[in-house]
A protein has these predicted regions:
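Metal-dependent catalytic neighborhoods of phosphoester/phosphodiester hydrolases
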Residues: 91-99, 126, 241-249
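Cap/insert and terminal regions of metallo-dependent hydrolase folds
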Residues: 182-265
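Conserved beta-strand hairpin/beta-sheet module of binuclear metal-dependent hydrolase folds
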Residues: 20-71, 162-178, 195
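Short internal beta-strands
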Residues: 110-119, 232-233
Length: 268
């Protein structure tokens, strides 16, 4: 790109910055509520972008609607699913139909790969739809390559089979816990991550272990022991004052803590 008299200097700089951003590892929160979305919001969904590749992590209720504020459904390159609870996959069906309709309108879309585990054969089978999407089973014991991303997995403690993910690209690492109560294996799995996207379904005085979830104290201790650079609390409860979750987590973790918010973006 070259600066010309027809292009203002500021527009030139802006376009350079946009081009450079494509080479950063960028995380954008699409939805973050646990269980179900609040009014005009979404449950679990996170967009990762790097080198022009767009990967959606989980696709819960409301995610497709919110995603269209950033990109269109046909612009996705892949989807990666942690497990098959509705608050993480509810919008898979409408994503499939969106791409189907775009095809009817003359837009040529390649088959979209939907990566998921095959420990639930019925749910996994629904990931394949006509020539629109193709379910691809990941092997949790192996590193998965999706576009520019290298993904490793850790089975979580949750009522159904569920996998946490460590997603790496160009020396940067984001760990997404998905749904789980705390387990010691998380520490090494998350060691020195740039971002820990940690579920926080309960307040510090509540015990979420039997439900397969963490509370704010669990998240803080986890982040401190793993020596992560930044903790993002997500999968948030629908009651109480959620700002208290930061205060409670900060009693254990001395680093940066933020609550997940709609369209919140972090570039690494």
């Amino acid at each position: 790109m070259y600066y010309t008299e027809k292009k203002s200097f500021f527009e030139y700089i802006r376009n350079i910055n946009i081009e450079l951003e494509e080479f950063n590892l960028k995380l954008t929160v699409i939805g973050f509520w646990g269980g179900y979305p609040k009014q005009n919001a979404a449950s679990s969904g996170y967009l990762l972008e790097h080198e022009g590749f767009r990967l959606l992590i989980d696709c819960g209720s409301g995610v497709l609607s919110k995603l269209q504020n950033i990109i269109q459904p046909e612009e996705l390159d892949a989807v990666l699913l942690s497990h098959y609870h509705p608050d993480h996959i509810a919008d898979i069906g409408v994503l499939q139909h969106a791409r189907l309709i775009q095809g009817f309108l003359g837009k040529k879309n390649s088959t979209l790969p939907l990566y998921g585990h095959d420990m639930d054969p019925y749910e996994f089978s629904k990931l394949t739809y006509k020539e629109i999407t193709k379910g691809v089973a990941y092997n949790p014991s192996e590193i998965l390559t999706v576009g520019p991303f290298q993904v490793s997995f850790l089975k979580t403690d949750h009522p159904v089979p569920c996998y946490a993910m460590r997603i790496e690209a160009d020396g940067k690492a984001i760990v997404y816990t998905a749904d789980s109560s705390f387990k010691d294996e998380f520490i090494e799995f998350s060691r020195n991550a740039d971002v820990l996207l940690c579920e926080c379904n309960f307040y510090g005085h509540q015990n979420g272990k039997s439900a397969g979830h963490m509370n704010s104290i669990d998240a803080g201790k986890f982040a401190q022991k793993a020596d992560v650079k930044q903790l993002i609390l997500t999968h948030l409860p629908h009651y109480g004052s959620i700002s208290e979750l930061i205060t409670e987590a900060a009693s254990e973790f001395t680093g940066i803590i933020i609550l997940a918010e709609e369209f919140q973006s972090i570039s690494l």
